[in-house]
Amino acid sequence: MIGVLGVKTEVKLDIREKLSIIPKRYESSLMKLKEKCDEVVILSTCNRTEVYYSYKKHNENIISHIFKCLNWDENYKKYTFHYKDDEAINHLMRVICGFDSLILGEDQILSQIKQAYEIALSSKSVNRDLNKLFQMAITCGKEFRNKSQLYKIPVSSASIAVNEGRKHGGKNFMVLGYGAVGSLAVKYILSGEFDKLYIVVRNPSVVDLRDDRMTIINFNERGKYYKDVDCIISCTSAPHVVVDAFELPKHKNIVVYDLAVPRDVDEEVRYMKNVKLYDIDNISCINDENCSKREDIMNNNLFVIEKYEREFEKWRKTSEISPHIVNLKKKGDEVYKKRLTTFKNKKYTKDVDALAEIMLKSTSNAYINKAIEVLKEEQLKGRGEECLRIIEKIFYSAQ
């Protein structure tokens, strides 16, 4: 069975924080979950936390096991959803295509799911079912974007934050963190007008961009530069607050966008008269001008999702008989190798053509005689008609 346990997108941020998984705990969490499931993939972004799993043996306590492994309070179960098999598969396909998101059609989710899959792959927490499902989902996401051409009207929490920052008169930006979201925010800032950009990182070597208006500063020195900016975009993976209220200037207007979950910005910042603070929920509520256009385009391309759902279901059904196919091939090898040995031993002592005919006839009889034997047995059991239909399909239609 394949399933997914996730946090509902409409749940308030303070609850989502308690049900989040920070990146540095991914691998240890995967290992704990792997003890209860056959396969596991963790997807944790600023807008969603989801655990995809598979297992062969029935486990009615799977949700409790997941909560326990992740040290989540079971009183929060009501804030989660749980889908199985077809619903879980459909959910992943829709998510990777940008549906079921706080920001419809967001363009970060494909790379985020790909990264989640790669972490699970390197941690050896996926093998057959989830491996194939995520491979197909990633291909589905790429095809969906190509067919819908959503790249022409991109949207993400980073793009909204940068655009809104500019609307508030932002010219001097600071971006804290240079992961997937941070690097995207930097890209959007560099593509438009600005005076100064400060990129705050723990390891300056990760930023390989060059621009005279850009300054890379060490994380520990960030407080010195708050007075020089009018827009802060924070998107680190820290489990604690990184922007404290007491560090911000008291007499300078600043707009702050907190794109992190758990939140990067001290909640006290919200009460500062000279600072406007927007968290990820506030940003997700900003209905950008292209929202309805993206929705129409996406709905017109739902057939892509349906196509990959059918393909995965087809793969699942055929993969169930894979062990039998392997055994059939082994049996075929046994039949021909035994006769090949006989042919090699006798080809110089008998007429080669006659010997070849005998060997080929023997190979054919090995299967025909067994088919006749099974057909007779099934006829006596009242299943002769069904057996004959299969035999006809195998032998009579063979070329």
Curated annotation (Swiss-Prot):
The record marks H91 as: Important for activity. InterPro entries: 4pyrrol_synth_GluRdtase, 4pyrrol_synth_GluRdtase_dimer, 4pyrrol_synth_GluRdtase_N, GluRdtase_CS, GluRdtase_N_sf, NAD(P)-bd_dom_sf, Shikm_DH/Glu-tRNA_Rdtase. It comes from the Bacteria. Substrate binds at T45, C46, N47, R48, S101, E106, D107, Q108, Q112. Pfam families: GlutR_dimer (PF00745), GlutR_N (PF05201), Shikimate_DH (PF01488). PROSITE patterns: GLUTR (PS00747). Pathway: Porphyrin-containing compound metabolism; protoporphyrin-IX biosynthesis; 5-aminolevulinate from L-glutamyl-tRNA(Glu): step 1/2. GO terms for biological process: protoporphyrinogen IX biosynthetic process from glutamate. Gene3D superfamilies: Glutamyl-tRNA reductase, N-terminal domain, NAD(P)-binding Rossmann-like Domain. Its EC number is 1.2.1.70. GO terms for molecular function: glutamyl-tRNA reductase activity; NADP binding. It catalyses: (S)-4-amino-5-oxopentanoate + tRNA(Glu) + NADP(+) = L-glutamyl-tRNA(Glu) + NADPH + H(+). Keywords: NADP, Oxidoreductase, Porphyrin biosynthesis. During catalysis, the active site Cys acts as a nucleophile attacking the alpha-carbonyl group of tRNA-bound glutamate with the formation of a thioester intermediate between enzyme and glutamate, and the concomitant release of tRNA(Glu). The thioester intermediate is finally reduced by direct hydride transfer from NADPH, to form the product GSA. Homodimer. Belongs to the glutamyl-tRNA reductase family. This is Glutamyl-tRNA reductase. It comes from Clostridium tetani (strain Massachusetts / E88).
